[in-house]
């Protein structure tokens, strides 16, 4: 795999150069990832991307090609190139489990190390967590709106080809049942889905020929796209050719509520009571909710999912919260800029629960560990110790664990969190 080290901003390395020159580069520091606010009206966010970051961390190194580029462009000096040549991360990383809900100021990731090794991770880390968490947060709202009906990720053609793989992973973590993206299926063991598009029908001289070809190749349990020409004619034709075994039909246009109801009635009248109806066509969580009373069996979601459904970033930041002073002690530090202030000190985090196991507050502490308080659930887990990645957070296993964590975390939130009405974060963030 190619190195991930240049998936970063120019200033990370010029800052490193200046720190090496000043003698401060080896000071121990703690950086935290958090968001100051949720997107307007959102009640919670869902963390995703941690596993991807950890996978890429193993490849965050500077090989000959990268060093040659940095040297030829005079981006950094020889001393900095020498440091980068042997760069490996040797610190500690902890944070919220992937799939966990987060709120304003939740320390979703905490990086401990020297300033030099922690600062250069900023851009790479944030680019992953901001995108993946935006998709997961949207996917969580969509899957909640869908209830027991599965949502299927179909957004690859609306995203960068690599981002599409990440989006598929994040969507499945946040409750989606599968993806159309084969690379995501290969890399993360995700269930993949799909049958045919309008182009397949238009390729043939008639809809009959197209359906016959699809059924011969894929079997009667396939899903036929029935709105290329006339929906009624296509449904009747599909039933004629496949009989009661026809797996499903897909609707991709028009008034989906009315059309789904009509198609369900038609299928039932033809004896195909078990044939499923899938709807697509630029769905978001609100469109899915509007279809709750319609006889729909599953939803295919694309554009709105991979763009965060109106919130394409999670607005996460990476800030140093403590650093080693001249006496060798860790000293809290904080940014004081108006509107962008940070809170100094390395945080510990826990979620306060009531007697029913429902979350009532996000509790953060610097001098006190809130996980030691009564009726709280600890939120921080270790991912990397002394530069060594702990097992279970990457690859297929990482996705499985994150999917389970999302389901448990969402179930723990007050019922109002799963509604689409706008409001403040569903639980407050408290500092102790």
Question: Where in the sequence are the language-model features?
Answer:
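Ordered alpha/beta subdomains of enzyme catalytic regions
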Residues: 1-217, 320-432
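Glycine-rich phosphate/ribose-binding loops and adjacent secondary-structure elements
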Residues: 199-355
């Amino acid at each position: 795999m190619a190195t991930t080290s240049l998936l970063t901003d120019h200033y990370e390395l010029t800052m490193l150069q200046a720190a090496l020159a000043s003698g401060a580069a080896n000071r121990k520091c703690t950086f935290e990832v958090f968001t100051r606010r949720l997107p307007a009206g959102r009640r919670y966010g869902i963390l995703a991307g941690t596993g991807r970051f950890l996978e890429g961390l193993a490849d965050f190194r500077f090989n000959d090609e990268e060093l040659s580029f940095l040297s030829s462009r005079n981006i950094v000096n020889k001393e900095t190139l020498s440091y980068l040549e042997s760069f490996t991360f040797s610190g500690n990383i902890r944070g919220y489990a992937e799939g966990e809900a987060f709120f304003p100021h939740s320390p979703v990731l905490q990086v401990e190390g020297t300033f030099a090794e922690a600062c250069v991770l900023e851009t790479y880390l944030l680019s992953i967590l901001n995108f993946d968490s935006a998709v997961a947060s949207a996917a969580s709202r969509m899957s909640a709106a869908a209830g027991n009906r599965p949502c299927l990720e179909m957004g690859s053609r609306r995203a960068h080809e690599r981002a599409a793989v990440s989006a598929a992973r994040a969507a499945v973590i946040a409750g989606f049942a599968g993806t159309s993206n084969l690379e995501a299926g290969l890399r993360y063991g995700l269930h993949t889905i799909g049958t045919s598009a309008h182009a397949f029908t238009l390729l043939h001289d008639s809809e009959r020929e197209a359906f016959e070809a699809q059924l011969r190749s894929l079997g009667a349990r396939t899903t036929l796209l029935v709105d290329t020409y006339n929906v009624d004619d296509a449904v009747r034709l599909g039933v004629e050719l496949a009989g009661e075994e026809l797996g499903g039909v897909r609707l991709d246009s028009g008034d989906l509520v009315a059309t789904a109801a009509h198609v369900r009635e038609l299928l039932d009248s033809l004896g195909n009571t078990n044939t499923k109806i899938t709807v697509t066509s630029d769905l978001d969580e609100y469109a899915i909710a509007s279809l709750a009373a319609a006889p729909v069996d599953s939803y295919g979601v694309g554009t709105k999912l991979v763009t965060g459904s109106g919130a394409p970033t999670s607005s996460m930041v990476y800030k140093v919260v403590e650093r080693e002073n001249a006496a060798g002690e860790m000293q809290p530090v904080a940014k004081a800029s108006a509107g962008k202030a940070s809170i100094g000190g390395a945080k510990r985090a826990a979620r306060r629960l009531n007697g029913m196991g429902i979350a009532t507050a996000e509790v953060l502490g610097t001098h006190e560990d809130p996980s030691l308080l009564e009726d709280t659930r600890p939120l921080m887990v270790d991912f990397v110790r002394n530069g060594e990645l702990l097992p279970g957070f990457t690859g297929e296993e990482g996705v499985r664990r994150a999917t389970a964590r999302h389901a448990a975390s969402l179930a723990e939130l007050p019922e109002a969190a799963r509604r689409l009405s706008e409001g403040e974060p569903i639980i407050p963030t408290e500092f102790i």
